[in-house]
Regions:
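Catalytic active-site module of serine/aspartate enzymes centered on a nucleophile-bearing elbow/loop
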Residues: 134-170
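Glycine-rich, phosphate-binding/catalytic loops in enzymes
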Residues: 25-29, 126-129, 159
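Conserved beta-strand scaffold positions in the cores of enzyme catalytic domains, especially
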Residues: 8, 110, 140-142
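Short beta-strand/loop motif that positions the catalytic acidic residue
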Residues: 103-104, 110-112, 116
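Conserved alpha/beta-hydrolase catalytic His-Asp/Glu region
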Residues: 45-83
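Conserved alpha/beta-hydrolase "acid-adjacent" motif
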Residues: 117-126
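Active-site nucleophile elbow and catalytic-triad environment of alpha/beta-hydrolase enzymes
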Residues: 72-100, 106
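Flexible "cap/lid" loop of the alpha/beta hydrolase fold
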Residues: 2-41, 84-88
Length: 170
């Protein structure tokens, strides 16, 4: 196990894009467009409209549930991380750089939603392939029919159970 102070094990959901993760599906671009569409948003917090939230977060749940999630969880988010992720593959010193081969990292479960528009399955699988090069346990689970809201929508317990099952094995 890793030394004290480092995570002993982790379950990561909807991983942000980092350098060497090449897929960039159109759905991810569309989800990020409310922020990336205006370069001035780099230094701003940007709020999504209910329609934008529905596409990026609530696409795999009913319209009613998406609206409830929007009302409860939607807040303006910083633009900078999206801009950093967008140019990660063009900047070797990117703030999003990840040392996926760190041998001191503990076991990692990468969790994805099959219908996620914001971090599409192709991005999650490409991230997993990078993390899989680590000498420690790395596993991947994809939840069928689930979107980016998978940790807060009506099926959250399935995700929590999978994460708990993973971390209690180590």
């Amino acid at each position: 196990l890793p030394p004290p102070g480092l995570p002993q094990r982790a379950a990561a959901t909807t991983l942000a894009q980092f350098p060497v993760v090449l897929p960039l599906p159109l759905s991810a671009l569309r989800s990020a467009f409310p922020v990336l569409g205006n370069p001035l948003n780099y230094g701003r917090a940007v709020a999504l409209t209910p329609k934008q939230f529905r596409y990026g977060f609530g696409n795999a749940v009913s319209e009613e549930e998406s609206q409830r999630l929007y009302d409860r969880y939607s807040v303006a988010g910083p633009g900078r991380p999206l801009f950093q992720a967008a140019v990660a593959n063009f900047n070797p010193a990117s703030a999003t750089k990840v040392n996926t081969k760190n041998p001191e990292r503990g076991p990692l479960l990468v969790i994805s939603g099959e219908l996620d528009h914001t971090v599409p399955s192709a991005v999650a699988k490409a991230s997993y392939k990078q993390y899989k090069k680590n000498p420690n346990v790395t596993e991947f689970v994809e939840f069928a029919g689930r979107g980016h809201s998978l940790v807060v929508d009506n099926g959250w317990r399935d995700v929590a159970d999978a994460a708990l099952s993973f971390v209690t094995r180590f």
